[in-house]
Each structure stands twice: as C-alpha cells, then as structure tokens.
Amino acid sequence: MMKQKTIAKEFSVTGVGLHSGVDVSMTVKPADIDSGIVFRRADLTPVVDIKVTPSSIKEAIMCTLLTKDGDQNLSVSTIEHLMSAFAMFEVDNVLIEVNAPELPVMDGSSYEFTQLLKQVGIVEQNSARKGIKILKPVRVEHEDKFAEVLPSDTLKYEFKIHWDHPVIAATNDHIVFEYDLDEYIKMVSKARTFGFYEQLAYLHQNNLAKGASLDNAVGVTNEGVLNEGGLRYDDEFVRHKLLDAIGDFYVGGYILGHFNCFKSGHTLNNKLLHAVFADKDAWEYI
C-alpha cells in the first residue's frame, strides 16, 4: 500500500513571476493527510486558499492557472514547474503560501524545486495514497494537436513536438519517460522554458513574459540560442514540454496511465484532465 506524503519541514524561495515580472515570495509547508495541495494567496485580505483540482483550472495563455470558484481575481498561475517536481517526489499534501498571483519562475525549470525538496526531505504519512488507474483511452484534439492517456501498469509520459523553426526543428522532437525520480532530476528537471525573441514585443503588449530573461528562459532566434551557455540538453525544448505536461497532469493527482501528447500545451493538457474525470468509465480508484 502506498502512503500519502508531505515535506518534512517548510522552505521558502523568492524570485520573479515569469509573466507578471513581479517579485514573489513563496513558502512551502507540510500539511496533514487528505489536505491535498493548496495554494494560499497570503497577499489578499482575507487570505484565499485555492485547492489544486481540475475543477479549479481556468483557461489561460502560456501557463496553468487555478482560481477560487472561477474568480480570476482570486487566482494563482504558472504552477506547472512546482507541480512537476511534486509529481515526481509524490507529494500529496502541502500548503504553498505566496504573496502574488504568480509563482516565482526560478531558473525556468523545476531543478531548483527538486533540490529544495531533496534538502528538506519527504515523509510518509499514516494514510493510504489516493489515486486513479486509467481503464480505457481518453483523448482530446485541437487541429493537428492531441493529448491522450492510455491504460498502463506503469506511470509513463510520451511527448512529441513540431515547430516550423530552424533551431527547434534541428533538435530531437520526441521523448519517452517512465517514472523514475533520479532520472527525472538528471534528464528532465533542468530543461528550461523557452521563447522566441521575435515574439517578445507582442508578448509584452499582452502582459506576458514581462519577467522573462536569459536567466530564466531559453531565448531563441532564427539564427540560434541567445543564452551564453547554449542548451542544457540537445533536446531541451521537448524535455521542457514534458516537464510542463507532468506538472499539468498532476493537477488531477496521482493518475496511473500512459500520457501521450503531440504538440500539446497547457490548454490541451488541462482539457485532457477534464475529459478523464468526466468519463467515470475511463478509470477506477486505486
């Protein structure tokens, strides 16, 4: 029997919001059994708690955003990198206090979160872990993109990207990853978010990527990568999309299945979660 888990002690970080450009402080605290993962907007009066659940997802551009009762003013966004780390460390119960509507982006990957989780430690709790097992395929599509989850006895992720862009097209576009914490830390967690330099002005006009820099993202032009050290992995682009997807799908909690995505992003990932939980015949509790 798998047990629920939380962190052994709290930790705090500061950083900048990727899209808002605002300085953010965040403290992650242990939580009791069956608490789930809860974000607390400590900057609001009274404070607002937003539980991580598919029903809290609100459609957003270029990130995953959760709201309290659908209220855009009571929200927390860009949670996917932290959630990705939580998924791999099997964290079930935790309280995240944040003083802004967006999490700090750190270096654009989940690596710093993995190191903090290793540092504070993970503890088992005296209650069975709750999750679901996929019994039949569930798939969502948009144009030529799709995201699906298939029955599997192991937790597995597969991602394929396709960009008509000379730099990204020159890299490996496909990755398969079976759950393994050490492998995740080594081969996935350091992959950074990326963006196209030519789109930066447009993004800023739409209040996006205001906190983006070469310290927290891979900058891409038609000629190459702007970051002085280049890419961390030859196929960093597809690895980061995998990192994001792991975090997005963990909004649904522990789901045993084989996730398979083609050109999927946050919107399609989130739609897949909704489709899974809407079809009661597609899964069973474990």
UniProtKB/Swiss-Prot annotation:
GO CC annotation, single: membrane
Top-rank EC class of the record's enzyme: hydrolase
Pfam family, one: LpxC
GO annotation terms (biological process): lipid A biosynthetic process
Catalytic activity: a UDP-3-O-[(3R)-3-hydroxyacyl]-N-acetyl-alpha-D-glucosamine + H2O = a UDP-3-O-[(3R)-3-hydroxyacyl]-alpha-D-glucosamine + acetate
Paired cysteines (S-S): none
Gene3D superfamilies documented for this protein: lpxc deacetylase, domain 1, lpxc deacetylase, domain 2
Pathway: Glycolipid biosynthesis; lipid IV(A) biosynthesis; lipid IV(A) from (3R)-3-hydroxytetradecanoyl-[acyl-carrier-protein] and UDP-N-acetyl-alpha-D-glucosamine: step 2/6
EC code: 3.5.1.108
Active site: 266
Keywords for this protein: Hydrolase, Lipid A biosynthesis, Lipid biosynthesis, Lipid metabolism, Metal-binding, Zinc
Cofactor(s) this protein cannot do without: Zn(2+)
MF-aspect GO terms: metal ion binding; UDP-3-O-acyl-N-acetylglucosamine deacetylase activity
Metal-binding recorded as keyword: yes
Residues noted as binding Zn(2+) in the record, renumbered to the chain: 81, 240, 244
Purpose of the protein: Catalyzes the hydrolysis of UDP-3-O-myristoyl-N-acetylglucosamine to form UDP-3-O-myristoylglucosamine and acetate, the committed step in lipid A biosynthesis.
Family per similarity comment: Belongs to the LpxC family.
Protein name per its UniProtKB record: UDP-3-O-acyl-N-acetylglucosamine deacetylase
Species per Swiss-Prot/TrEMBL record: Francisella tularensis subsp. holarctica (strain LVS)
